[in-house]
């Protein structure tokens, strides 16, 4: 076990990193904290690419379809690491409609392989959903197929399911990580931290908000010195909390919230308040789920954020 370390190392210009399917730069942030100099990123979404550029001002960002991008565009000097998480919706266990190889997103791992094969970084980190471990194309397991492809182009490969809450993130989200290197190093995944960051440690310094409230700029409710180490890390470049937006739910929905304790869900709501549900017993366990303040959050999916309830306030998450 080990303690969380939120300190940022000075980037080493010799350790060049590339982030594919970069989003706003979550993997890149971890890489820079470890001393890697993020030089390039590829992200097709305009808004995500703009966020990445703002977060990593020294990086060159290619905002385009990776399938149309030549790896030579990024291959200007020796690269230490390529990282990325190809689109995962098609592999997700929650996807019951297009969870097969006919989903074009399920072939995007081929693009990651193409860039690694062409650029030949010393290391790569491939991240995806747990569901990929159970996914088959015919009789072949896709995870095994991907790992063997990396081995075929000269990499020593190891993989493991990691939980974000074991490494300083206040959310119990699991992901498959496949890590490889060209030096034959028998890589070991890092040990879990000796504690988990709770929901309260993560958000208790944020403004108190009402149902449907929009507060583009507010004030922290806890002084910096009294905030948790995690909150201090989140606030180190911020003087005020911004873009605090709460989904507006109807009054009868807010009334339901009042009956739900921390860790409880729809099952705590009286039947007379659930009249619009044809069969309440068929509700998913995550519907009307109030988070437990003293523990990491359950997995948060943005498309259903209003179904997760603030641990101390009768509203959805902001």
Question: Residue locations for each model-derived region?
Answer:
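Short alpha-helical segments and helix-capping/turn motifs at coil-helix boundaries
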Residues: 66, 161-165, 283-286
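Extracellular/periplasmic catalytic domains that process cell-envelope and extracellular macromolecules
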Residues: 62, 75, 170-172, 291-294
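Flexible, glycine-/basic-rich loop-and-beta segments that form/coincide
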Residues: 168-224
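Short catalytic/ligand-binding loop motif for oxyanion handling, primarily in non-cytosolic enzymes
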Residues: 28, 89-93, 132-135, 168-171, ...
């Amino acid at each position: 076990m080990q303690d969380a370390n939120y300190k940022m190392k000075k980037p080493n210009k010799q350790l060049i990193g590339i982030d594919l399917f970069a989003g706003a730069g979550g993997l890149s942030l971890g890489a820079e904290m470890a001393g890697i100099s993020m030089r390039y990123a590829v992200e097709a979404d305009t808004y995500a690419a703009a966020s990445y550029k703002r977060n990593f001002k020294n990086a060159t960002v290619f905002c385009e379809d990776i399938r149309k991008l030549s790896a030579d565009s990024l291959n200007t000097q020796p690269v230490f690491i390529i990282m990325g998480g190809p689109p995962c919706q098609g592999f997700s266990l929650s996807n019951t409609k297009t969870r097969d190889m006919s989903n074009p997103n399920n072939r995007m791992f081929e693009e990651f392989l193409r860039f690694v094969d062409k650029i030949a970084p010393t290391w790569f980190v491939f991240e995806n959903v747990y569901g990929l471990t159970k996914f088959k194309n015919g009789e072949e397991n896709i995870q095994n197929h991907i790992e063997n492809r990396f081995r075929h182009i000269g990499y020593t490969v190891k993989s493991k399911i990691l939980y974000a809450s074991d490494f300083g993130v206040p959310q119990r989200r699991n992901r498959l990580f496949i890590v490889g290197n060209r030096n034959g190093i028998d890589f070991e995944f890092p040990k879990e931290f000796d504690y988990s960051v709770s929901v309260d440690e993560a958000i208790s310094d944020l403004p108190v908000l009402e149902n449907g409230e929009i507060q583009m700029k507010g004030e922290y409710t806890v002084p910096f010195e009294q905030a948790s180490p995690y909150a201090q890390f989140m606030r180190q470049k911020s003087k005020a909390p911004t873009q605090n937006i709460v989904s507006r739910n109807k009054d009868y929905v807010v009334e339901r919230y009042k009956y739900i304790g921390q860790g409880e869900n729809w099952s705590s709501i009286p039947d007379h308040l659930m009249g619009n549900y044809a069969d309440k017993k068929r509700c998913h366990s995550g519907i009307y789920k109030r988070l437990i303040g003293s523990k990491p959050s359950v997995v948060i999916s943005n498309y259903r954020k209003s179904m997760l309830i603030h641990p101390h306030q009768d509203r959805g998450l902001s």
